[in-house]
């Protein structure tokens, strides 16, 4: 229900304390309410690929959409708009007025921990995808919060690192997606990044925030990332409206003190409070549910399945190995991801899904008459798999005292698995700063043998099985990457177990502040977390041998493996581009035997090294596909969906080939963006370095022809009448399909060093066999402009510009040109 209040009246009549209270959150997810003036609290919620609601722990299940790079791989404005609508509806069901997304940072390195959250390495593609999903979300009444402005392109020391970037690269690459969003979508909120830009944290950097409000004439609510406010005076004066989360750390009484010292003006407080009230007024129009609920509807499942299938990129299909005929009699499914799909990355993307379809179940459904052989082949987990389906009667008890003391039970919560994240958990009487918990449950293994147990913790924890201590993770802790970079490495123990016998599992847990570990540059959300995993101990060589055996028996083999949220997550970056240990050996062994009938399906949010790619006939990139991961992959493998995804980022042969390789972590608190504007394909093309798969690459089960000459009209660029490129495209193959045509602009005669070409438009066209259509791609002023650092303005340089239309950045199929007759400078959007 819309809150009925007049902003001017409220601002003129509320107390100074109320004004100041508005400028920070009331708790982890809400803004402050002023009931006397009918100003309600506004609920915000993560995350980039689904709506978690207000609880990391014991939350309401949610729809899980494919990850950001998967959505970027669709190159589909309409699908992204539909995805935004679904996210908006999920927000409404969770009682949330404001979605904390989308993420539009740049994948300058394949190692970035949150690379999977963003859409693309190209700023134009990223901005257009963001615009589409924002407009979809905000059509439901929910406000979108585009993030993280700007330069949070890696996780290493993200709160402390000073990103050193030239003004030109900042404008042309890293700010451009936000600029497109400001021009085309103007969402209601913007979230600042944790890091510094050129010496000053963005959250308190007036030059950076003035770009948004003054240069782009866009006036969103500007909020901090969670615990990403570092000062009172500087952040207020720079333009930060809302410190999140609450309770405040840098506002409240500190603003009062700064006012008394005349370090913050009354007009500044009024301006920030007005912006929060305007945000509340707009957000409160969203018809949110009074309670957090689910909405797992058939039409949402169908959309999620379409999103997943359309995101899948067919990287190789030598000899038309795919699609696999549904008449196949015997098929081998190999890989850790076959029965345990990777549906999302970690961190803010984590949520409790309504369901997750595995590839195994999807293949069983698609091939009811086939014999299906399965072997894991090699484990791909970094942390042992959480105990869930073999767990029963599990609860967690909360106390303010450790287990060795007499203590009072404060709360009991049921749990469905042995992982918990308590950053936002609270209970009456619980001391959030220091508390203890005991998880107890019954574990019934399905296989006899020696079992491995692994315990990772942010805090301290000890594992007991039938009251025998199996793991002590309390005293000799080593920092790892889990839980936003605050957790320990996994401590491992073993125990001999019998199938069908029930064992008592007990975890004695101490909250975050019981841990002696300290770290710089990572976010301390508090509360604490733990992950207990378990699996049967297996000999790696025997696992590979078992996999090779079933591959030898099968007519076709599908190997599905890759990364998961253990490897790609907020809070840390990957150390290398490699697949998990043992995976390459598994794939190579299967290819040695059956390369002519084996398809490799990789799940990751960003590129991984594929040393066996030249020997594989069929390679599919399936990303993190959300709830419908298994269905989406199976739909493509068996030809129910003709693959149409295109890579939204370049796929290097080796991590050392990446332009950010020498500058991908904080060194002494600084990180130099030394590649300047030559990021991604711009770098590979400029230096002539080969990649494994180029930006924009993706194959189809059909073929297309495109007219070699693009008609560009008008031939002279005018800001009043910018040109449009038109080409004729025809489906020359046997099945219906979609082609994504990518428009690149080259300025070969420019006096200023520029990339060989840059993406400035694209279109996706669906055609039946034999159908042809003329498609148009519009060209805007960004296509001819670069940032002139001397004039501190955009410069559209006179000269002839080449129009290059391709099916990837390397496959140019049509050409045209236009000219700019007079150099001009401009600012704004």
UniProtKB/Swiss-Prot annotation:
Pathways involved: Glycan metabolism; cellulose degradation
Cellular compartment(s): Secreted
Gene Ontology cellular component list: extracellular region
Superkingdom as given in the UniProt entry: Eukaryota
Known EC number: 3.2.1.21
Q: Which GO terms describe its biological process?
A: cellulose catabolic process
Q: Does the keyword Secreted apply?
A: yes
Q: Which reaction does it catalyse?
A: Hydrolysis of terminal, non-reducing beta-D-glucosyl residues with release of beta-D-glucose
Annotated InterPro entries: Cellulose_deg_GH3, Fn3-like, Glyco_hydro_3_C, Glyco_hydro_3_C_sf, Glyco_hydro_3_N, Glyco_hydro_3_N_sf, Glycoside_hydrolase_SF, Ig-like_fold
Q: Which residues form the active site?
A: 225
Q: Cite the entry's keywords alphabetically.
A: Carbohydrate metabolism, Cellulose degradation, Glycoprotein, Glycosidase, Hydrolase, Polysaccharide degradation, Secreted
- The UniProt record lists the PA14 domain at 389-548
Enzyme class, spelled out: hydrolase
SMART domains, sorted:
Fn3_like, PA14
What glycosylation sites does the entry record?
13, 304, 473, 602, 627, 664
Give the molecular function GO annotations. beta-glucosidase activity
What does the similarity note say?
Belongs to the glycosyl hydrolase 3 family.
The UniProt function text for this chain reads:
Beta-glucosidases are one of a number of cellulolytic enzymes involved in the degradation of cellulosic biomass. Catalyzes the last step releasing glucose from the inhibitory cellobiose.
Q: What is this protein called?
A: Probable beta-glucosidase H
This chain's source organism reads: Neosartorya fischeri (strain ATCC 1020 / DSM 3700 / CBS 544.65 / FGSC A1164 / JCM 1740 / NRRL 181 / WB 181)
């Amino acid at each position: 229900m819309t809150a009925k209040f007049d902003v001017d009246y409220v601002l003129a009549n509320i107390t100074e304390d109320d004004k100041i209270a508005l400028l920070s959150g009331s708790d982890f997810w809400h803004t402050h309410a002023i009931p006397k003036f009918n100003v309600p609290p506004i609920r915000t919620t993560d995350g980039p690929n689904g709506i978690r609601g207000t609880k990391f722990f014991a939350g309401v299940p949610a729809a899980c959409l494919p990850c950001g790079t998967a959505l970027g791989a669709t190159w589909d404005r309409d699908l992204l708009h539909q995805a935004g609508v679904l996210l908006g509806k999920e927000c409404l069901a969770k009682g949330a007025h404001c979605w904390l997304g989308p993420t539009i940072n740049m994948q300058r390195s394949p190692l970035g921990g949150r690379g999977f959250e963003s859409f693309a390495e190209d700023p134009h593609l990223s901005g257009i995808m963001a615009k589409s999903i924002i407009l979809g979300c905000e059509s439901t009444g929910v406000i979108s919060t585009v993030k993280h402005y700007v330069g949070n392109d890696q996780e290493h020391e993200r709160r402390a690192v000073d990103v050193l970037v030239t003004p030109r690269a900042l404008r042309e690459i890293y700010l451009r997606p936000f600029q497109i969003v400001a021009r085309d979508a103007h969402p209601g909120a913007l979230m600042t990044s944790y890091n510094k830009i050129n010496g000053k944290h963005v959250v308190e950097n007036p030059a950076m925030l003035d770009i948004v409000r003054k240069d782009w004439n866009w006036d969103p609510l500007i909020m901090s990332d969670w615990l990403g406010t570092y000062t009172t005076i500087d952040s207020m004066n720079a333009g930060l409206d809302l410190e999140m989360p609450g309770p405040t750390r840098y506002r409240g009484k500190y603003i009062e003190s700064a006012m008394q010292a005349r370090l913050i003006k009354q007009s500044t407080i009024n301006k920030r409070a007005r912006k929060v009230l305007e945000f509340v007024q707009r957000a409160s129009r969203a018809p949110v549910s009074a309670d957090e609920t689910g909405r797992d509807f058939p039409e949402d499942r169908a959309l999620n399945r379409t999103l997943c299938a359309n995101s899948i990129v067919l990287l190789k299909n030598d000899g038309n190995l795919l699609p696999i005929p549904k008449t196949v009699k015997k098929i081998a499914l190999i890989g850790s991801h076959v029965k345990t799909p990777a549906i999302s990355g970690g961190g803010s993307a984590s949520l409790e899904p309504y369901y997750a379809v595995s590839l195994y179940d999807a293949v069983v459904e698609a091939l009811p008459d086939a014999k299906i052989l399965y072997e894991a082949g090699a484990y791909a987990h970094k942390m042992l798999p959480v105990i869930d389906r073999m767990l029963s009667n599990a609860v967690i008890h909360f106390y303010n005292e450790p287990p060795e003391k007499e203590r009072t039970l404060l709360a009991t919560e049921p749990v469905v698995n042995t992982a918990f994240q308590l950053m936002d958990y609270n209970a009456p009487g619980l001391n959030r700063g220091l508390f203890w918990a005991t998880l107890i449950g019954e574990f019934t293994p399905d296989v006899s043998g020696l079992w491995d147990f692994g315990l990772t913790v942010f805090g301290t924890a000890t594992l007991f099985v039938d009251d025998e201590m199996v793991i002590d993770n309390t005293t000799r802790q080593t920092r790892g990457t889990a839980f936003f970079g605050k957790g320990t490495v996994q401590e491992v123990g073993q125990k001999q177990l019998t199938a069908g016998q029930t064992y008592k599992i007990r975890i004695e847990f101490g909250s975050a502040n019981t841990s002696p570990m300290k770290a710089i540059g990572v976010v301390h959300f508090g509360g604490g977390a733990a992950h207990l995993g378990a699996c049967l101990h297996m000999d790696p060589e025997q696992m590979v041998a078992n996999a090779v055996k079933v591959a030898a028996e099968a007519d076709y083999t599908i190997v599905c493996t890759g990364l998961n949220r253990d490897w790609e997550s907020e809070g840390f970056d990957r150390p290398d581009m490699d697949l998990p240990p043992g995976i390459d050996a598994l794939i190579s062994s299967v290819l040695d035997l059956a390369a002519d009938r084996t398809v490799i399906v990789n799940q990751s949010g960003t590129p991984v090294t594929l040393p066996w790619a030249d020997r594989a006939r069929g390679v599919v990139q399936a990303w993190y596909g959300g709830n419908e991961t298994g269905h989406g992959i199976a739909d493509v493998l068996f030809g129910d969906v003709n693959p149409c995804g295109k890579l939204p980022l370049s796929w290097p042969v080796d991590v050392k080939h990446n332009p950010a390789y020498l500058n991908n972590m904080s060194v002494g608190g600084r990180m130099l963006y030394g590649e300047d504007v030559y990021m991604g394909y711009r770098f590979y093309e400029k230096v002539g370095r080969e990649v494994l798969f180029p930006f924009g690459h993706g194959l189809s089960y059909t073929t297309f022809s495109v007219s070699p000459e693009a008609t560009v009209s008008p031939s002279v660029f005018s800001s009043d009448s910018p040109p449009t490129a038109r080409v004729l495209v025809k489906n020359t193959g046997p099945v219906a399909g979609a082609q994504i045509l990518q428009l690149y602009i080259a300025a070969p005669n420019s006096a200023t060093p520029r990339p060989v070409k840059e993406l400035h438009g694209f279109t996706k066209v669906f055609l039946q066999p034999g159908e042809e259509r003329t498609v148009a791609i519009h060209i805007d002023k960004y296509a001819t402009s670069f940032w002139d650092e001397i004039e501190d303005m955009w410069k559209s340089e006179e000269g002839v510009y080449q129009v290059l239309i391709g099916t990837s950045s390397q496959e140019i199929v049509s050409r045209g040109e236009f000219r700019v007759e007079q150099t001009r400078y401009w600012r704004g959007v």
